[in-house]
């Protein structure tokens, strides 16, 4: 089994400190595991956590405010619920959400992920969404994208974004980390693209990011993993 496969199937720090594994993995192999774990657990607010992990997220932009909790029975998928206050349609509702990891590729210095995401309103099953979310990152560089096709009883729409960024410095695991990003997003309800700078900070299990544009105003995201 390769290091990549090993990490993908065992994203658990307890594996690293287990003595039997320690004596069977060469020093460079241990370094690779730490590096991939650092990328996997730290840089990006992932829609799937480690096996048995939970994540609480809050989002706010010009379209909606939402609070989203998800639980990951395995590293391959997560299930959750999202409470939404939609500013555009002036309505409150919830989604039952399911996210599945379609593909993950680990190298010595990077990780690539591709996810399927979906949600359904249990009170109005005709209101739902499907989409894709992906990212590629190293400790220095990040790129990501997202796309949603939303079915709504009032009006259907799509929401999409791309994001690129870099870390101005490389901290150690557990340090405060900073990312400087550029994000461009488009919502078919509003038309046109909105591009703006984003700052992201994370330390341990806590992450916050925010950006601002005159057209879309504040775009904020807070996450805590436990």
Regions found by a protein language model. Name each.
Residues 46-182, 194, 198-226:
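Transmembrane beta-barrel domains of bacterial outer-membrane proteins
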Residues 188-192:
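Membrane-helix boundary connector in multi-pass membrane proteins
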Residues 1-48:
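Cleavable N-terminal export/targeting peptides
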């Amino acid at each position: 089994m390769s290091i990549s496969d090993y990490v993908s199937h065992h994203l658990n720090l307890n594996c690293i400190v287990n003595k039997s594994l320690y004596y069977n993995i060469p020093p460079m192999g241990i370094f690779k595991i730490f590096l991939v774990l650092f990328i996997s657990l730290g840089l990006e607010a992932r829609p799937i956590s480690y096996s048995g992990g939970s994540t609480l997220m809050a989002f706010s932009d010009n379209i909606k405010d939402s609070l989203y909790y998800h639980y990951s029975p395995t590293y391959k998928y997560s299930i959750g619920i999202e409470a939404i206050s939609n500013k555009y349609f002036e309505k409150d509702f919830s989604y039952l959400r399911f996210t599945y990891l379609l593909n993950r590729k680990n190298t010595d210095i990077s990780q690539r992920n591709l996810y399927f995401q979906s949600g359904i309103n249990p009170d109005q099953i005709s209101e739902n969404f499907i989409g894709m979310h992906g990212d590629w990152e190293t400790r220095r560089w990040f790129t990501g994208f997202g796309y949603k096709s939303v079915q709504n009883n009032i009006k259907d729409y799509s929401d999409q974004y791309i994001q690129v960024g870099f870390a101005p410095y490389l901290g150690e695991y557990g340090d405060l980390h900073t990312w400087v990003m550029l994000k461009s997003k488009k919502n078919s309800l509003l038309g046109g693209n909105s591009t703006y700078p984003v700052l992201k900070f994370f330390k341990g299990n806590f992450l916050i990011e925010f950006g601002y544009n005159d057209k879309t105003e504040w775009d904020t995201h807070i996450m805590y993993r436990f």
